[in-house]
């Protein structure tokens, strides 16, 4: 409706209406659309100075700042683009806009990559690894940029600065994935040992990497977690999950015997759970 009303108004009247809307809607998520409408109307009137003033006034809006940064990048005005990005990062910190600072850092990274500024690329990748979400992307970039003889020390320091999630999402963990890539078996084992949430899923995903070095301890962890799970969980779906865990134990050294012992114990302990007995009949 707003678009229709504005489109049938003379330009001056349309600008007046937009100014009113900018005041009454200043806290709405689509405010930037009104700003762009005003800027376009001013440019149609060859009012470039007023258009630029409007843009500067609303640079605190993410969409407007991003639009201006993109224009500067197209014109290869990289230093000015970085200045706007740094301003945006400070605003994001002050206003606590989650994710916005990472957005600006990612654009800065692209500029530094385009201009072959290796030192700045490393600094931004490191910051995005420590504070951002897509950690494996920046881990992989950094591993190609840091000299091999410096990599272990660099990574150790960076990992200590990083706060990783205690949860294994769908059994997965960025921290664990990095230990796998680095073949750091001791730290992977320590992480699995300290996991208190979804430990079975974590073991199913990562234990096989440690079968040559930690099978005995992993079998003990599996057995303890599986006993606890069986004690607390009932129903066919949960029993089928137990049946998915057992082959993972089987792959470890000594796992075949461990599976036989677990199943034998369950057949005695849970003999009054017919659905479990049916699910375990093939073990």
Q: Where does each model-flagged region fall?
A:
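Eukaryote-biased, non-catalytic alpha-solenoid scaffold regions
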Residues: 1-283
